[in-house]
Amino acid sequence: MRRGARAAAAAGAAPLEAGGGWRARARPVPGGGRYPAGDFCSRCGLCDTYYVAQVGEACAFLGPGMARAEALEERVHGRGRDAASDERHFGVFQERFAAAMAPPVDGAQWTGTVTSVAIAALESGLVEAVVCVQSHPDDPLRPMPAIARTREEVLASRGVKPSLSPSLEVLAEVEAQGIRRLLFIGVGCQVIALRSVEHHLRAAGLEELYVMGTFCADNGHAEGLQKFLRETSCDPATVTGYEFMQDYRVHLKHSTGQYEKIPYFCLDANTLSEGVIAPSCASCFDYVNSLADLVVGYMAVPYMQVPMTAHPTIVHVRNRRGVELLEPVRGRMVETPLEDSGDRKPFVLETLLSDDRAALGRVQAPAPLPVGEALATVLEKVGPKGLEFARYSIDYHSLRSALKVKRGFSAKHAGQHIPSYAAATFAEYDKGGALSERTQWSSWAEEEAAQVAKRRRRLDAALAALSSARGLRRFALPLLTVAALLGAVAFGAANYTG
């Protein structure tokens, strides 16, 4: 069941506020208009309805921004996260496990855990409706938010649509239909905004709100998705989904049922660094969807050499409502032990520096396929696995977002936007101020000049030390010359090898 969001906004305003009020006065952003968060807007859909009036208190990219999630955790879950535990990375949770649905849901991206939970919630009467994302009739990867009231309507939302979705555009319609018990399925930026306006929904008649989330990173606009597929796949028109797996390859699922696997190292970072990932996603700190009641995702499960449609995912149960959502389907899930091994930290910094240099404009040729395959095979054996791989991904995305925010936001806005746990991660990796220094650079030329200046200072310091050493003064100039030559050769080799 779906109507145009702006029509629903108009229809829903009068019965809610016959005497006027913010709903009646609000003016949704018109088609093609500029959204309040500008280039950093995640197109969550809030501003496409009369809820645009609440954007200042709800938007994940205005004012406190992503830090809103941290402030809301206690209200949503009954407590904030324990930053001294694994909750620093994964958010509040009371239970987590890896599992697959048995049998899997036909047509799902994975085994259909999200779909199964939504259908069970609807058919058990736990909720009256489910806000989900169906596919546009003209493009299966184009998201189309919907209010589902039947099994068939939920099944129509199977599969991941890896681009920005205006899911909150249905809020006015939810109110217009008088829905009392609702399940919302969405990603972090949407859920932050939803939780921020939840009290308005309750004032309008909503009695219970359940939120099921997915892990989310690196989405973009539809054009960015198409660019990624063109640059990555040999047959982009038949791709129905993809995932960056723990075997260090991106797995692209095709409508034929075949999988195409490309090593991370064979992706063209220079081409993909522009126009693929939305600025909002590149400045996000809620990869783990911390305000959802129940979260389902892949990133913490090692690759098990089976297709995605048979592969376990990880489930985080955050609170009582999460337990209620999961209980009806728990008996149909096959659980597998969680793995946690390796050391993420060296991999985090290498990935961050490589990607950031590409973002700054440094030309880096992708690895030839045989080299990429060899690297992926080795790293799958020696790199972080399971939960540690997830921490690697979370740390990397958090640091990348911090660099983006510190460069693109004012100092005040950046300080508001970055949650304390993300700031702690930045400080942990900012040894000697190396990351803070990077925030001052806006191009590869600036980084290159800074590195040359740093080498020159080191040489000057060495010369000064040699010059002051008794009996070594006559050797200072020859030693300096040799050091300079060796430094030049090393710098050239580093740039040549990428």
Predicted regions and their residues:
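Iron-sulfur cluster-binding cysteine motifs and their immediate structural context
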Residues: 19-77, 294
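Long, compositionally biased charged/polar accessory segments in the mid-to-C-terminal portions
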Residues: 127, 232-463
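Low-complexity, highly charged intrinsically disordered N-terminal segments
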Residues: 68, 108-141
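A short alpha->loop->secondary-structure connector
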Residues: 199-213
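Short, conserved secondary-structure transition motifs
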Residues: 215-227
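Terminal signal-anchor or tail-anchor transmembrane helices
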Residues: 473-498
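Entry/capping segment at the start of metal-dependent catalytic domains
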Residues: 58-114
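N-terminal mitochondrial targeting presequence
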Residues: 1-24
